[in-house]
Swiss-Prot record:
SUPFAM superfamilies: P-loop containing nucleoside triphosphate hydrolases
Record-annotated ABC transporter domain positions: 175-448, 853-1106
Disulfide bridges in this chain: none
The UniProt record lists the keyword Transmembrane: yes
Compartments reported by the entry: Membrane
UniProt-listed InterPro entries: AAA+_ATPase (IPR003593), ABC2_TM (IPR013525), ABC_trans_N (IPR029481), ABC_transporter-like_ATP-bd (IPR003439), ABCG_dom (IPR043926), ABCG_PDR_2 (IPR034003), P-loop_NTPase (IPR027417), PDR_assoc (IPR013581)
Gene from which this protein is expressed: ABCG39
Record organism: Arabidopsis thaliana
Residues the record lists as binding ATP 1: G208, P209, P210, S211, S212, G213, K214, T215
Transmembrane segment boundaries: 544-564, 584-604, 623-643, 663-683, 689-709, 716-736, 775-795, 1199-1219, 1231-1251, 1285-1303, 1312-1332, 1342-1362, 1367-1387, 1423-1443
Keyword NAD tagged: no
Function: May be a general defense protein.
Protein name: ABC transporter G family member 39
Stored CDD domains: ABCG_PDR_domain2
Amino acid sequence: MAAMLGRDEDPVGALSGRVSLASTSHRSLVGASKSFRDVFMPQTDEVFGRSERREEDDMELRWAAIERLPTFDRLRKGMLPQTSANGKIELEDIDLTRLEPKDKKHLMEMILSFVEEDNEKFLRDLRERTDRVGIEVPKIEVRYENISVEGDVRSASRALPTLFNVTLNTLESILGFFHLLPSKRKKIQILKDISGIVKPSRMTLLLGPPSSGKTTLLQALAGKLDDTLQMSGRITYCGHEFREFVPQKTCAYISQHDLHFGEMTVREILDFSGRCLGVGSRYQLMSELSRREKEEGIKPDPKIDAFMKSIAISGQETSLVTDYVLKILGLDICADILAGDVMRRGISGGQKKRLTTGEMLVGPARALFMDEISTGLDSSTTFQICKFMRQLVHISDVTMIISLLQPAPETFELFDDIILLSEGQIVYQGPRDNVLEFFEYFGFQCPERKGVADFLQEVTSKKDQEQYWNKREQPYNYVSVSDFSSGFSTFHTGQKLTSEFRVPYDKAKTHSAALVTQKYGISNWELFKACFDREWLLMKRNSFVYVFKTVQITIMSLITMTVYLRTEMHVGTVRDGQKFYGAMFFSLINVMFNGLAELAFTVMRLPVFYKQRDFLFYPPWAFALPAWLLKIPLSLIESGIWIGLTYYTIGFAPSAARFFRQLLAYFCVNQMALSLFRFLGAIGRTEVISNSIGTFTLLIVFTLGGFIIAKDDIRPWMTWAYYMSPMMYGQTAIVMNEFLDERWSSPNYDTRINAKTVGEVLLKSRGFFTEPYWFWICIVALLGFSLLFNLFYILALMYLNPLGNSKATVVEEGKDKQKGENRGTEGSVVELNSSSNKGPKRGMVLPFQPLSLAFNNVNYYVDMPSEMKAQGVEGDRLQLLRDVGGAFRPGILTALVGVSGAGKTTLMDVLAGRKTGGYIEGSISISGYPKNQTTFARVSGYCEQNDIHSPHVTVYESLIYSAWLRLSTDIDIKTRELFVEEVMELVELKPLRNSIVGLPGVDGLSTEQRKRLTIAVELVANPSIIFMDEPTSGLDARAAAIVMRTVRNTVDTGRTVVCTIHQPSIDIFESFDELLLMKRGGQVIYAGSLGHHSQKLVEYFEAVEGVPKINDGYNPATWMLDVTTPSMESQMSLDFAQIFSNSSLYRRNQELIKDLSTPPPGSKDVYFKTKYAQSFSTQTKACFWKQYWSYWRHPQYNAIRFLMTVVIGVLFGLIFWQIGTKTENEQDLNNFFGAMYAAVLFLGALNAATVQPAIAIERTVFYREKAAGMYSAIPYAISQVAVEIMYNTIQTGVYTLILYSMIGCNWTMAKFLWFYYYMLTSFIYFTLYGMMLMALTPNYQIAGICMSFFLSLWNLFSGFLIPRPQIPIWWRWYYWATPVAWTLYGLITSQVGDKDSMVHISGIGDIDLKTLLKEGFGFEHDFLPVVAVVHIAWILLFLFVFAYGIKFLNFQRR
């Protein structure tokens, strides 16, 4: 909610016009002439007068006592009426800083009786109070002069993000940076030399078709333009340029994209926002207001006084502002429900859109720029919100621009001014009343039953313009946007605007509270506390993850202590120390790896952070520090669990001092790891890149830690990297703590090593320090790394921006582009013309069976949310649908309408069989036969509200893929392709055929383009019954009209189509044949025909006593929703659901349901010989085809994979340079073993980690496609694995060539092929392992935790840390159950297992290499064929589990 008060330090400081948009009670400000009794006490007989006067005197005394308080205390005290035990209303003193929820609720009930009616009066009371004492309200006038914005794009096929293009584009960018190659990017102009004035106290509507530049204009005015765009021109606020104030705090930009933490409730999100944005100058205002009222003897209304004082108190965890915003945005009903996300059930899309609006309204900004705030909202809700905005603008003198896609006529009438934007040019800017006159000036007229807003968005379109030509005596000629724009300057409104520009704004008139000069709304300490509280809340909501991590490290410590049991751990010799080395290294790995989950959490929270950072909610350090500080206790707990369980059971040095030193070392390592992963997450910014960078960093850190390869064996040119590795300091600290203990002080008899004791020999053999003070140096170094990584984390948050963008790409070039556009235009014109009243265009009708759908007494329940139980709501189930009945018939277009939260999508999900949880009751029949979901999926289509598509394929490929799998086998390829082309033409997708779909809000298609693709994907399936959930949501009026014409054409072919729809215009609403209207609570209140011009609908509701008549020209859809709101029901004491159930219309509806629930004579139930439209092999082929193109165009995944492969190969080659040529002593063999271990484990782990985010994105698409009956899970699994194997094969080839040559292995064909084979199969099973875990867990965060747990086990039992013969007998079986152990067996044995050389072993002497491998490690060369076969078995096992997981597990909650 906007601030009610001004923004400056000036005590007179000015009332900001934006208080809550909530209403007040019917009494307001009370002047000196009224007493408190006049406000609250009813008039009574004289017999009670004396006692009432005593009460009044008491009230006056208490108010006087408040006025005598010091200013600081006085502004925190208020008086609120309370009902006493005897039923009397009494004023009670109350501390406004400690308002309980019941107090806020009580005040809300007094101020807000009916929001729709009382809001204006409430705002006037607030304004009157400040006007009465002469406090001036600040105003902001925004001017933009000659603004042009342009951006760079790549042209033609080079814009597609294939691996080849990304490589080429990267090389070009590097060469271009050094001016060695001219840039091949093209400039596109988004805004073209536009100028205008946005005035306070006038609400401005911004209209324009998609890609017209609306969002760019709003972002430019708000000072939030993308850094990659170039802007010229001048923008001023009250004559001041951006450098003179802080635009992000002076104004508020409300984005199209709904980014919120799904773990927080609606109220918590708004409270946090209000807390960070601050109160502006409300406190100074209240101080001055209170002083002036005291001087003039004015006693304010206690309710108004309490409200204004409460919202003026800074630093509150929760504010009344939140309660008011919840009320006026209609979010009070879901205030305590989680926002939700992709995998977590939460509020609806419309409610989330309102939450995005509310998040900025709770702040004190004086100018508001709102970008498409009505997406997903019904027309009634949009109207109410815009009405509140209008009251705010007019009463409080706020500056406001609102961009809307499909404003209904009544909503359009609320605006004062219009800015019409098209092709980056302003066609019209000025009063709404003159806009039709302007177009009549050009010869165009708006039809009678056409919304003006719809007309304005279509009249500039070449495809739609001609139908509005009104000068019949003159031939029509297309009037271009440039012609309109230039003609506006000669129109009287344009001339007036030009004359206003000639007079510069007088800076001296700028109110001191108008422009904000402080960067943040509250103090640094308050910002830190707010972020700290939120971080603690998020940790509690994600407690499962932290509990899971704790359980994981507990289990792992129990396993470790049984592997390295102290009875098996001997002390005193060098060979005994080797086993302790393995135990300490593994412990270090686990404590460090347990912090890997921090990387996923960081990436997950970045989108919300970037939004709030750019809006100046808080500085980056305030976001980063709580995440660091709150993890310190967790580090202590995890380190304590590990040390407590393993230290003495393994048999480390027994003294208490060394125990606590070891605990300190592990704690520091864990803190360093958490800090490192947070930093890497902020650097990577996406799951794939972060996982790649994270795994690569771990590889370097671990390899150079001193255990895998000794320091003395590292080449001199890599020594610096050894000292840069944090792992080295952790490893040094723990091994020094152990081996400098007295029990390792046996004298050393090996003269080749200059050391006095066995402990020093163990340290020096691997290059560790032996001086005791190095332990503390290492501790300080680890803490220093932790501080450094946290500092880098803050810097990354401060300076890096999110990856990905939504810029357009030029798909065609030159003449080809023009031809393509012409073809698309001509086809569309033909379609639009042919879909007129002369008769529908049926086009190519593929064979299908017309089907009806009837349902009755449908009830749907979900388990009661814990948040609602916490609020005192009783019951175990929450009912969302209540006795819903209806029928959908072939050739009949049915609208499913209701306010947000009425249950429209819920009903559609139930009918379509898309619900994955909850409890369903009732009957559903298809053409008289009980619905069978398997066959129903074959004959139905479902256009979901959320446009879910594979992001890395093109539009054409998406449609071909859908048609390929869903059309029957008797339709040949040519017919199928022609049908796809026709559908693309119907939905106007031909110009976008080669565009990448992309991720919503990140890249690729815009919202409206994505919506049209969703519809086309279902239409190409040729379904008999089509469900469309909000098909026009997010579309402008013209795009919505195109979509609805497509829908109408579909219905005219005899199909059954039902659409939920939020905000239909008159012509769209009246294109429907029948209506099913629902009210909040999931009850039907109308089901029947609309009639001509909605006559039957209007007659039905007007016949209800008390319902106001519809006005001429009013949208029947909006009127219908307005008169059936809960507040109207309450006012008229009606229940529309009860009225409907007692009506003749209900009885006719029941008769229809009964008829359609009975099979017609001679009919047969829908039956298919096979479950799926295509055969198993075709499904596999089609899925592989899509996955092939998806992977080819996913450079973030595959380009990074190959880059990391090359970098890791080269680095390992340098670290282990020619290590394979030396097998003279035990350390040489350990180094080679370490090289093979690192080469397999780390790149394999990288594959397993990076594949999971890619699988997570595709899994969401898989859920939709599986529900649509496109394919079985097995072909999908096989195809995805096949594509991965293809890339793994190439990856292994690159890696093997680099590594094999640099580490110095023998160049024989057999050994090279064995090396390649084991590397390839290991990379495949690692990748499949990551895919398998993704299929078995709800999200990739949990999958990542599970992966780190099992990788730790694989690491422990790989045979490197503890050879198989030394593993206790009770754990030896798990060695054979560890894939990495088999790979190391194969690699080591194939490379050196056939050598006859001798190896020197300390304390033993020379021994034959084959004997050493057999007795020391359990390796035999003759066992290689078995090892090779087992690798295939691992691959098949993981493939089977992956397929099983995606087939039987569904983590989507609907």
